[in-house]
Amino acid sequence: MKNEKTETEWFENEDFWLNYGPIMFDGQQWAQAAGIAKSVMNLARLSEGNSVLDVCCGPGRISVELALLGLNVTGVDITQPFLDAASETAQDEGVQIEFINKDMRVFSSRKKFDAAVNIYNSFGYCDRISDDIKILKKVNAALKKGGTFVLECISRETAVKYFTEGEWFERAGMTVLTEFKVQGAWEG
């Protein structure tokens, strides 16, 4: 059996996240985190002491707020510098959170969680639907029987309604150009 080189997915590029992180996780995003965490707690019917898996937790924006609400949080992300920042924030806020550096396509846990969350549209990054299904199966396997998965994503209808091919904007002292394109299954 020969070793086949697999192509690296764009979201596995740590430099991308280090450059884009200040734009993606600006002050406005951090300011909204407490309200989002409370909404997650209500949606998932969680109580103090319940366990939550924060899938693709990034720099811990939601993980820390969930922990401040009294939940036992485990955050998983592929980008180690984000996890380092998340650990520092958790320490500064006086909460204990387990952060794990792992790709969700291969993550597994012996621990079972009352709920899992994936916030800020980080689901659907994979080029292959089979990888998205793998992630959903991994999350399901990590949940206790009857556990809840709160998944934030943009619906097709919303994406189409607000679609733009690109835009320029200023944020975090940078000028940013975004470019978007539609690929398959969006017709009609």
Residue ranges and their predicted role:
Residues 133-145:
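A short glycine-rich, Lys/Arg-flanked "PGG" loop and its adjoining helix->strand segment in the class I
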Residues 119-121:
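Residues lining the SAM
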Residues 59:
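Conserved SAM/SAH-binding loop
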Residues 1-47, 49-56:
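Conserved class I S-adenosyl-L-methionine
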Residues 150-188:
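SAM-dependent methyltransferase
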Residues 63-106:
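Class I SAM-dependent methyltransferase SAM/SAH-binding core
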Residues 108-115:
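A short acidic, Gly/Pro-enriched loop at the edge of an enzyme's catalytic core
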